[in-house]
């Protein structure tokens, strides 16, 4: 059996591990547009609070751990088409595109950040650190900034507010709900 999972965040990885337990002989593939898996979105907080030395340590699982479980990782790939009738998906990476067959398909594409829907949010000054690549880009900008606006006061936003205040930054909080 060939199991393909689109999305390699919490749900996708959980589905891959559960599938491996239930179907030990299956060929299992995780497809994701990110370059890495297992990054904890609270990694910046852990880094700036000196709980970890490098952002790469903010992981709940590594690529190697998944490979040891015989789970194939197809990273830096974006699914661009599906042919459900013939059980095929197409993924692309740079100039390359390939069709990939499956017996079972699991969609685990996860949540998206609301900030991407804000007009002007594509500026380099708006930091999004749900993924490791964004967190790595955020570190030098946060270190040199004196004033920071945090959009969203959910758990990750509150962690950001905490470490930014400890860094002696002026912090402005924008939250759509009435209470924090």
Predicted regions, residues:
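Residue-level detector of alpha-helical recognition elements and their boundaries
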Residues: 30-34, 43, 94, 120-121, ...
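Residues within well-formed alpha-helices
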Residues: 14-18, 134-137, 159
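Beta1-alpha1 glycine-rich phosphate/pyrophosphate-binding loop at the start
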Residues: 1-72, 163-180
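Mid-domain beta-loop-alpha active-site segment that forms a flexible
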Residues: 155-161
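Residue-level detector of alpha-helix initiation sites
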Residues: 10-14, 35, 111-113, 133, ...
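FAD-binding core/adjacent interface of flavoenzyme oxidoreductases
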Residues: 1-4, 59-151, 172
């Amino acid at each position: 059996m060939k199991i393909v999972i689109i999305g390699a965040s919490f749900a996708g990885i959980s589905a891959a591990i559960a599938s491996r337990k239930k179907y030990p002989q299956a060929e299992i593939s995780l497809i994701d547009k990110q370059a890495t898996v297992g990054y904890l979105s609270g990694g910046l907080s852990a880094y700036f609070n000196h709980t970890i030395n490098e952002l790469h340590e903010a992981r709940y699982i590594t690529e190697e751990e998944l490979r040891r479980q015989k789970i194939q990782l197809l990273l830096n790939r974006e699914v661009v088409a599906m042919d459900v009738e013939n059980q095929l998906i197409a993924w692309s990476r740079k100039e390359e595109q390939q069709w990939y067959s499956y017996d079972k398909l699991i969609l685990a594409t996860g949540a998206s950040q609301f900030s991407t829907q804000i007009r002007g949010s594509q500026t380099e000054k708006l930091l999004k650190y749900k993924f490791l690549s964004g967190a790595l880009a955020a570190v030098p900008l946060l270190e040199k900034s004196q004033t920071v606006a945090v959009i969203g006061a959910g758990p990750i936003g509150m962690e950001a507010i905490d470490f930014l205040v400890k860094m002696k930054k002026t912090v402005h909080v924008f939250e759509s709900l009435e209470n924090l």
